[in-house]
Amino acid sequence: MPLSSGKPLYFLSIPKTAGTTLYHILATYFPMDQVAPIQSLRKLIETPIGQIQRYRLIGGHYYYRVEPILGVKPVYITMFRNPVDRVISYYAHILRNPNHYAHHRVHNQTLLEFTEDQENLPLYANAQVRYLGLNRDILGVYKQLDRNSLSQNYFEQLMEGFAPNGFYDESYLECAKQRLKHFPFFGFKTWFDQSLQLLCRTFGWEIPKHYQKMMVNPNPFKSIDDKAVSNIRKQTELDHALFEHALVEFKQKYQEKVLE
């Protein structure tokens, strides 16, 4: 399906799902001046609407329902990752990055301690489902905060931790599944090459022969605590259900569009 002239492509990038790598590949299919820079949600909001509407490709950790920011309904695509692997990778990311709003609390925690600290649940509990299945009033929350709160990353913290009915409400999952029906493409970090093939077949692009993996860091853990893994599984049960649901759809699309 070629992209229509009136709708930008929006890559809803869930953290630690190979988003940076895919976005750089996506950017090669558009003129440079039509590709939005990867930036924070706050900076996207503060970008003049006239400039935003010149972009044909937009991507970042901006969640679902970005129409009020973009001024138009975009074409949504996304990537998924095994929930346990994603949480462990995100934990490692927070450890490495002192500018992350949770670093001050997490940097001295083991993975097990991280998963047992209830304050950390907003960071990762069923986060993939919450990225797709919730309606955040992004602009409304932004406008209510003063400059001091914005400068301290409080806005990002509120958006990431948004869960009006707690972290385990199955209605989030059902909503995410329904919304996914309208995504012409979604892929998986574990099957990145196959995802790239399906992406290109979906939009009529040439499949790149080579690409550079971005933001790839070696696994810093010699071993993973079994109890921590068990905790993560319980805290991401809805994510696992969405992952398995999406994988069935992905395999069917791959068979139809790539293999046949």
Predicted feature locations:
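A cross-family signal for N-terminal binding/gating loops and helix N-caps
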Residues: 2-44, 50-70, 79
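Short glycine/proline-rich turn/loop motifs
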Residues: 4, 175-180, 218-226
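Conserved aromatic-histidine-acidic binding/catalytic patches
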Residues: 10-14, 75, 183-191, 227-234
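A residue-level signal for conserved active-site and pocket-lining positions in enzyme catalytic cores
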Residues: 18, 82, 187, 199, ...
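Short, well-ordered alpha-helices that flank and scaffold nucleotide-derived cofactor binding pockets
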Residues: 24-28, 201, 248
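A generic structural motif
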Residues: 36-42, 87, 209-219
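PAPS-dependent sulfotransferase catalytic domain
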Residues: 43-50, 54-78, 85-208
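PAPS-dependent sulfotransferase catalytic core
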Residues: 57-65, 207-260
